[in-house]
């Protein structure tokens, strides 16, 4: 069987351990009004049978607002993980970890729902999501 032709130069992305499983409660780090989010799905994540799909820094996931205003609650939103407690090893050997697991809400068009992000944002998330990087006050 012949090998398929490459689709151009592929950028090297280091592996980040996926540590935020479906069902996890995470902090909402933007000013959309939501306080606590619950991860309900990680799209495009393939896993073994009976194993929960998990997300890591920079991943898109579907969430439900658990704590916040009534108009935001009990609806499915998209979110991007911007911080995780588990250490992320970078190519230069540095390990970066944060004090909480946090995400920002994303509209279907890819814009952030809030206009400000509280706290630092991991560099892995800002590389994948430039709209998130624009609102970040601090990128670590």
UniProtKB/Swiss-Prot annotation:
Any GO CC annotation of this UniProt entry: cytosolic large ribosomal subunit
Keyword Ribosomal protein annotated: yes
InterPro entries noted in UniProt: Ribosomal_uL14, Ribosomal_uL14_CS, Ribosomal_uL14_sf
GO molecular function, one term: large ribosomal subunit rRNA binding
Keyword Signal applies: no
Domain of life, per lineage: Archaea
Biological process (GO), any one: translation
Keywords associated with the record: Ribonucleoprotein, Ribosomal protein, RNA-binding, rRNA-binding
Transmembrane portions of the chain: none
One Pfam family named in its UniProt record: Ribosomal_L14
Purpose: Binds to 23S rRNA. Forms part of two intersubunit bridges in the 70S ribosome.
Subunit structure: Part of the 50S ribosomal subunit. Forms a cluster with proteins L3 and L24e, part of which may contact the 16S rRNA in 2 intersubunit bridges.
Family from the record: Belongs to the universal ribosomal protein uL14 family.
Name of protein: Large ribosomal subunit protein uL14
Organism in which the protein naturally occurs: Nitrosopumilus maritimus (strain SCM1)
Gene name for this UniProt entry: rpl14
């Amino acid at each position: 069987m012949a090998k398929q032709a490459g689709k151009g130069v592929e950028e090297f992305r280091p592996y980040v351990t996926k540590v935020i499983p479906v069902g996890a409660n995470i902090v909402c780090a933007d000013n959309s009004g939501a306080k606590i989010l619950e991860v309900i799905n990680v799209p495009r994540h393939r896993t073994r049978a009976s194993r929960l799909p998990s997300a890591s820094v920079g991943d898109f996931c579907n969430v439900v607002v658990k704590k916040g205003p009534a108009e935001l609650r009990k609806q499915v939103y998209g979110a991007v993980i911007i911080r995780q407690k588990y250490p992320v090893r970078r190519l230069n050997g540095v390990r970066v970890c944060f004090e909480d697991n946090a995400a920002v809400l994303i509209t279907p068009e890819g814009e952030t729902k809030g206009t400000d992000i509280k706290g630092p944002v991991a560099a892995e998330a800002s590389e994948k999501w430039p709209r998130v990087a624009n609102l970040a006050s601090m990128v670590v």
